[in-house]
């Protein structure tokens, strides 16, 4: 029987990766559908990745990760314990899914598109002239800005949201020296979420947080579950989306003809991506 140790090894310290990462990864994918690296197991085939994501026998083993990181008794640990209950397919998950199903539909998707367009437009207008770190000044702030839109917070708070998201997601680095920072960040996040919830309760609107509050007020969510969702949205607000935005812009600007075509016909953006 083959083990992980038998998988081919790919080395991200290879100078060729630093010089041309996309081309290097494409070459690795031609040779291997699955490999290993210093980061762990690497899935290099799209269909294989999709199969793993959809496979109900696969799990993140987040409980083991929390234990390995040595998260102490804290708001962070309490939150993680509650979130683990939502990752199985039992009663808690089914109840929460049922409570939230009505919040995502065609109308909400349309409103979100309009909100995203506003966030992107405002962030682009705020970019300084000259050379700029687009990942830091734009890509990181798009998903964080969308979170601000969800909770009716000013866009000026997007940097805080982005930094907190990055800090709590550092748990996946599996470096216990980061644990104190992660725990402190969760304390800040729960305080922030509580402030936003209190503010929206005083002036309810059509934003996503107001809708969550209404679900809680009819008894479909507990107060702690409402806060958990507000924090969970921050947790996931930056990492993959911000990285994807930066990668897409990098690749498209490397192809000026494609970039110009999209500028002339925005409907080409989706097939280009």
What are these regions (language model features)?
Residues 1-273:
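Cytochrome P450
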């Amino acid at each position: 029987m083959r083990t992980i140790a038998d998988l081919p090894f790919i080395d991200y310290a290879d100078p060729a990766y630093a010089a041309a990462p996309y081309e290097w990864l494409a070459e690795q994918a031609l040779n291997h559908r699955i490999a290993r690296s210093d980061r762990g197991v690497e899935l290099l085939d799209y269909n294989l990745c999709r199969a793993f994501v959809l496979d109900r026998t696969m799990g993140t083993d987040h409980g083991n990760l929390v234990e390995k990181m040595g998260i102490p008794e804290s708001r962070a640990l309490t939150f993680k314990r509650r979130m683990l209950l939502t990752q199985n397919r039992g009663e808690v998950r089914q109840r929460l899914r049922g409570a939230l199903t009505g919040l995502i539909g065609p109308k909400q998707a349309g409103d979100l598109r309009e909100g995203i367009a506003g966030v992107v437009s405002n962030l682009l207008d705020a970019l300084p002239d000259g050379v700029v770190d687009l990942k830091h000044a734009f890509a990181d702030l798009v998903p964080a800005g969308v979170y601000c839109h969800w909770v009716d917070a000013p866009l000026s708070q997007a940097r805080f949201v982005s930094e907190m998201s990055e800090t709590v997601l550092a748990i996946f680095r599996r470096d216990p020296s980061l644990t104190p920072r992660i725990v402190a960040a969760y304390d800040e996040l729960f305080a922030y979420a509580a402030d936003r919830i209190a503010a929206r309760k005083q002036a309810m609107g059509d934003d996503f947080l107001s809708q969550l509050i209404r679900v809680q007020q009819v008894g479909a969510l507990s107060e702690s579950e409402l806060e958990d969702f507000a924090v969970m949205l921050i947790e996931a607000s930056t990492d993959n989306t911000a990285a994807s935005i930066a990668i897409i812009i990098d690749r498209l600007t490397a192809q000026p003809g494609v970039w110009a075509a999209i500028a002339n016909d925005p409907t080409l953006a989706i097939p280009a991506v």
